[in-house]
Amino acid sequence: MAKSNIFVLVLVTFIVASCSDKTVITSNLLHPYAMCEYDGGILISNFGGDAVDYNNTKATGFITYYKNGSNQVVIPAGNGLYSPKGMAVKESFLFVADVNKIVVFDLDGYKKVDEIEFPQGDAFVGDLLVMGNALFASVANYDRIYLLDITAPRQIDHTSLLEYVELPCPSTLKLMGEYILVSSNSFGKADREDKIIHIIDDLGNPSIRPIIHEHGDYQGLAFSPNKTRLIFCNQERNGYIGNLVFENGEYSYEQVTDDKSLLNSLLLLDGKMYICDLLNSKIYIKELIEFDNFSGIIKTD
């Protein structure tokens, strides 16, 4: 009897529950863009308004806080947010990326304390990242990441806002040790071959290199719990999230929803993965079961 061994590499980072088992947050959401972990819960930025608009001209934006199964509005519309995007927290202060500005709130009472505007007047500020006393801000339409000194969050020197590094259509920023991963997303404004995922190697003397070469509109970066993989959204693959193995650079995609969606942001918290759907005003919650390595499956005929 002839026997053959078939070795199958399973490129699966995680197994998620079927669509019928998934939990979905919908309460008090209206076009949720980004999530930020805070005090055991999740701050969520919402565009508000009648339709998805990255550059709202009315202050329809608001922030909710999800914890213990409840999602409550903590910064209502009308408080100076138009299309609030990425967020970052330092101490008790929340920094919010918005249309041509960064807005600062004191989380003790959720009061607005400052607003740092970009001088050009039309900056698409997409995401923020805190590292020590520095705040990194991505601006997709300028092909730039900026740096702001936030040593004293109540007394920020607005003139400290400086260009940091140039790279194509920067959107989501994610810190990994002494490196920053940057997704590229033109938000439908340009079709460019260099819309990929980059890594900034040396933060003191920034240089960039690609870690994914496939053209796409990338958004929402997260790490697997053991930091061996990068999980991401590619908005050119509707309803799917991707995962990349750092060890060998291979990646694959996992379907999250059959709905026409715009998956925009990812957050891993307490063994669950939260996935923002900007278009449908939903956040999917998935249980996460992870494999550390590829699984070898041997079949004998």
Regions found by a protein language model. Name each.
Residues K101-I102, L107-M131, L161:
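Asp-box/WD-like beta-propeller blade repeats and closely related beta-sheet repeat scaffolds
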Residues S20-T26, S70-G78, K111-F118, R154-V165, ...:
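A short beta-strand motif characteristic of beta-propeller blades
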Residues Y66-S70, D106-K111, D149-R154, I200-N205, ...:
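Short loop/turn segments that connect beta-strands within beta-propeller blades
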Residues V16-S18:
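C-terminal motif of bacterial Sec signal peptides marking the signal peptidase cleavage site
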Residues D53-T64, K101-V103, R144-L147, K195-H198, ...:
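A short loop-to-beta-strand structural motif that recurs across blades of beta-propeller domains
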Residues L29-D39, G78-F93, P119-G132, F136, ...:
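Beta-rich, blade/repeat-based domains predominating
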Residues L263-D301:
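Blade-level signature of beta-propeller repeat domains, shared across WD40, Kelch, NHL, RCC1
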Residues N28, I44-T57, F95-K101, A137-D143, ...:
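Conserved beta-strand positions in repeat-built beta-propeller and related beta-rich domains
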